[in-house]
Amino acid sequence: MKIFDYEDIQLIPNKCIVESRSECDTTIQFGPKKFKLPVVPANMQTVMNEKLAKWFAENDYFYIMHRFDEEARIPFIKHMQNSGLFASISVGVKKAEFDFIEKLAQEKLIPEYITIDIAHGHSDSVINMIKHIKNHIPDSFVIAGNVGTPEGVRELENAGADATKVGIGPGRVCITKIKTGFGTGGWQLAALNICSKAARKPLIADGGIRTHGDIAKSIRFGASMVMIGSLFAAHEESPGETVELDGKQYKEYFGSASEFQKGEHKNVEGKKMFVEHKGSLMDTLKEMQQDLQSSISYAGGKDLKSLRTVDYVIVRNSIFNGDRD
């Protein structure tokens, strides 16, 4: 098995067939809806909130609302659907979450997307939750995760998952690999590659995205959608406290299993960091789209499919030319 990560890979260009990158189409059909970009902000408290979720839905971007305000989920679904927008929520696997799914079914509240969101998703509890959702609200598109192996993908798909999230602890604020010794940190792109060989349904690459070029690489190695945390954090519109350090503006960014999210020191697999303020989120999305259009033009195509077949080379840590500043 070839082991590599994002910074080890460079994609090889093909002959360009477009006059301008603006001809390149970055849209993706994912579940029942079509979106402008194959990216989704991480469902974390410092990345996504209700106001941003509404803006993303209004502008044809995919989002997943986090699950850390459980009581707000039903009002959120009602508000989104009453506004003519799609609802995309997260659930865990505790007993109360199974009851929550039954309550949605009783109230005939059917979110278009439900993400089962736990750190180690290749588990009986996730499989049981997939089956529970499909039994009670079969019309919801179920995303399950996270996994890091082909076996995990197969089992979740066989249980009824419509898409699977791949990535165990490669994110910037995730310390799973340090706390537990397990994870896909350092080989996330290779893990995505081997998982894609087993997948029959869409995969979401989750974690380890440091540059816009990593989005194109994720698609090359099997992702339909790319989940991004730190690159989406610390914008004007982002949740999180703004602080000034040495005359510069920063926003806090922490992991979903950190003590800052959990409010306790036990079973912590995330940390907090401060990310320099990045300005407008709309500008970042526009730049992401333009960079991805350029990627498609280098791939010799006009849409995302062209990225899936390009050749690549493994050149260890070459992408920064030895200069990480």
UniProtKB/Swiss-Prot annotation:
A single BP term in Gene Ontology: purine nucleotide metabolic process
One MF annotation (Gene Ontology) recorded for this entry: GMP reductase activity
Listed EC numbers: 1.7.1.7
CDD domains per record: IMPDH
Gene3D superfamilies: Aldolase class I
Source species, domain of life: Bacteria
Binding, NADP(+): 203-226
Pfam (any one): IMPDH
Family statement: Belongs to the IMPDH/GMPR family. GuaC type 2 subfamily.
Active site: 174
Keyword set includes Oxidoreductase: yes
Reactions catalysed: IMP + NH4(+) + NADP(+) = GMP + NADPH + 2 H(+)
Keyword terms of this UniProt record: NADP, Oxidoreductase
This protein's name: GMP reductase
Phylogenetic lineage: Bacteria, Bacillati, Bacillota, Bacilli, Bacillales
EC top class named in words: oxidoreductase
Keyword NADP in annotation: yes
Function: Catalyzes the irreversible NADPH-dependent deamination of GMP to IMP. It functions in the conversion of nucleobase, nucleoside and nucleotide derivatives of G to A nucleotides, and in maintaining the intracellular balance of A and G nucleotides.
Gene Ontology CC annotation, any one: GMP reductase complex
